[in-house]
Amino acid sequence: MAGRKTTRKRRVRKNVESGVAHIHSTFNNTLVMITDPRGNAIAWSSAGALGFKGSRKSTPFAAQMAAEAAAKESMEHGMKSVEVAVKGPGSGREAAIRSLQATGLEVTAIRDVTPVPHNGSRPPKRRRV
């Protein structure tokens, strides 16, 4: 077993001009995933993956950094414009969208795809702090 080579999978450059940026903003974290129009993942990032811990993950600044990291990675694959699909009630929604625009990606549309129940299951009880 000595001298065995491990081969790492080479990153393939996907040539994708436009795609969809899915921003999932929860009360605890913000996830940004950039896909092609069919839904195949090209790049992703989150506040936790960037090293933010605990309550710092839920800040708008952490969401901004996550969106910036995902946008830079997707631009290496040739991405130029994105539609934005925002989901969730978190504080990082607007910051992530602004960050995508600031990195040089053209935002063509913004959709809110937050799931709204038609009176489904009972929600968790209200916090008393």
From Swiss-Prot:
One of its GO terms (biological process) is translation. Pfam families: Ribosomal_S11. Signal peptide: none annotated. Keywords: Ribonucleoprotein, Ribosomal protein, RNA-binding, rRNA-binding. GO terms for molecular function: rRNA binding; structural constituent of ribosome. InterPro entries: Ribosomal_uS11, Ribosomal_uS11_bac-type, Ribosomal_uS11_CS, Ribosomal_uS11_sf. One of its GO terms (cellular component) is ribonucleoprotein complex. The keyword Zinc does not apply. Part of the 30S ribosomal subunit. Interacts with proteins S7 and S18. Binds to IF-3. NCBIfam families: PRK05309.1, uS11_bact. Belongs to the universal ribosomal protein uS11 family. Located on the platform of the 30S subunit, it bridges several disparate RNA helices of the 16S rRNA. Forms part of the Shine-Dalgarno cleft in the 70S ribosome. This is Small ribosomal subunit protein uS11. It comes from Lacticaseibacillus paracasei (strain ATCC 334 / BCRC 17002 / CCUG 31169 / CIP 107868 / KCTC 3260 / NRRL B-441) (Lactobacillus paracasei).
